[in-house]
């Protein structure tokens, strides 16, 4: 059995590779080419465990990803999100490979936001805000820089030390001007990415400039929320999956519960955009929101690409 560690993945693929892969994956998802049961969630003491199976119809493999989400302990220096992806031969069910899932998860999630940004953010977007300072936040920044000419990044965290450390890391690795931000900076920002486990909205509509694009990837349970209802009501909302968002997108679930917004107001699933490439032109001058909960086909598509490159 092949075993692939996180540190090996970066040597095989770039973020641009992943964005192209995930864009095609969304089109294939729209065409119904994947068998993908609803993600199962199990609560355990101190955290959440997720299981995500997927099979490409007539494909060579099927995958099952297991993800654990725990708040990092100050005593045990564990990561918040840890995962593994099992790859099986679809002809005989044999286990072919086991991939560390953390880097794949971070890269494909960043890439999904990159795809949405490619279609909905203003082409000359230069200013980015990132909420969160973990691995998911880094790949959000990385993907934004692949699809837009980002010159300045404002970093937001509840912990000033974390925002400074992350800013320095981004500046050094990605060669871009990154600095801790304050809410007033959002009036300058063209694109916002949120990658936090927040249970309270991070900012409000009044904080934003007109025509901003937001990628919200942090909330995956009904009680989690990053984006306020007033923003959702005043934005073109795109989702990775309407079905999954009704179960897992806390921002949207709470907006429907507590405001006049309804799921019928969703503009489109991202797959319909990548497949048809015609709706995004209506939204470039408007606020847009891509709400992603993550889908199993993204892991399968990326592991397929990795196996081809090995």
How does the language model describe each region?
Residues 1-106, 114, 124, 268, ...:
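N-terminal ligand-binding/catalytic initiation module
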Residues 128-129, 288:
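Conserved beta-strand elements of the Class I
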Residues 8, 224-310:
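Adenosine-phosphate binding glycine-rich loop
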Residues 175-260:
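Rossmann-like adenosine-cofactor binding region
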Residues 120-127, 149, 209-210:
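Short helix-loop-beta connector
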Residues 147-170:
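NAD(P)-binding Rossmann-fold cofactor-contacting core
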Residues 137-138:
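N-terminal Rossmann-fold NAD(P) dinucleotide-binding loop
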Residues 133-134:
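Glycine-rich Rossmann-fold phosphate-binding loop(s) that bind the pyrophosphate
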């Amino acid at each position: 059995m092949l075993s692939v560690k996180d540190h090996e993945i970066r040597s095989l693929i770039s973020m641009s590779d992943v964005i192209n892969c995930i864009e095609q994956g969304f089109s294939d998802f729209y065409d119904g080419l994947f068998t993908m049961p609803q993600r199962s969630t199990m609560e355990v003491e101190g955290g959440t465990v997720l299981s995500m199976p997927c099979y490409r119809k007539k494909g060579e493999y099927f995958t099952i990803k297991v993800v654990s989400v725990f708040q990092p302990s100050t005593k045990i220096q564990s990561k918040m999100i840890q995962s593994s992806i099992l790859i099986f031969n679809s002809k005989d069910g044999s286990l072919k490979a086991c991939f560390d899932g953390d880097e794949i998860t971070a890269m494909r999630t960043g890439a999904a936001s990159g795809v949405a940004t490619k279609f909905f953010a203003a082409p000359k977007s230069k200013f980015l805000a990132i909420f969160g300072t973990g691995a998911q936040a880094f790949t959000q920044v990385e993907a934004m820089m692949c699809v837009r000419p980002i010159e300045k990044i404002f970093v937001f965290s509840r912990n000033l030390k974390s925002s400074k450390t992350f800013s320095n890391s981004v500046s050094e690795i990605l060669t871009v001007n990154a600095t801790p931000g304050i809410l007033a900076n959002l009036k300058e920002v063209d694109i916002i990415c949120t990658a936090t486990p927040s249970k309270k909205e991070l900012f409000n509509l009044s904080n934003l400039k007109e025509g901003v694009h937001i990628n919200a990837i942090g909330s995956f349970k009904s009680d989690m929320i990053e984006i306020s209802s007033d923003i959702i009501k005043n934005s073109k909302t795109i989702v990775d999956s309407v079905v999954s968002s009704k179960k897992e997108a806390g921002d949207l679930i709470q907006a429907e519960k507590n405001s006049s917004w309804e799921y019928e107001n969703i503009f489109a699933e991202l797959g319909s955009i990548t497949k048809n490439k015609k709706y995004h032109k209506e939204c470039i001058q408007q606020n847009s929101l891509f709400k992603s909960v993550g889908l199993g086909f993204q892991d399968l598509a990326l592991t397929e690409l990795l196996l081809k490159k090995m």
